[in-house]
Amino acid sequence: MKITSAEFIKSAVWPPQYPPATLPEIAFAGRSNVGKSSLINTLVGRKNLAKTSNTPGRTQLINFFTINEKISFVDLPGYGFAKVSQSVKKNWGEMVEAYLKERQSLALVIFILDIRRDPSKDDLSLRDWLEHYRIPYLYVLTKADKLSNNQSVSQRSKIERNLHAEAGRGIILFSAKTEKGKNDIWQVLEDRLRLPERK
């Protein structure tokens, strides 16, 4: 997809603060420091649309962006950072679950994992949420440039087993550095957005 515009719309915490649901939404979810912002920036060809941070747990809001005035990208707060309080962890969980439960314009969740790390309990909880609410999702394994091809194949298989990913479920390897997987992700998004809105 040719990107002609990419704009930050607003940040929100709870459903009453969300922007109007006038466009199909693609949400980006994953643990802290997994590379969500870098993935969004690479997909739209902008360096600083989604703010990146070396401090895990910094993003504590739901950030909405409009792409080409046709799609909304939603950057969900990262989870699983050990140094935040239990109350903050609880708020993050409630914030993300409220979005997944309430947002009828949500078309797909990009479920992001670091290919070098095994799925955490929080990752498994997110998967369970998505399954419970019957939300379509795509696994994207980031930082693929950090491993050799053989290591990538091995780690991908291990992650699939840990997630109990069914045969045929899409898993795309991605690198912000090399842009590996960028076109594959866009192909999935374009195919998905031709489908009717989730009921």
Model-derived regions, located:
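Canonical P-loop GTPase G-domain recognition
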Residues: I3-P15, K146-K199
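Hydrophobic aliphatic residues
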Residues: L43-K47, L100, L163, L189
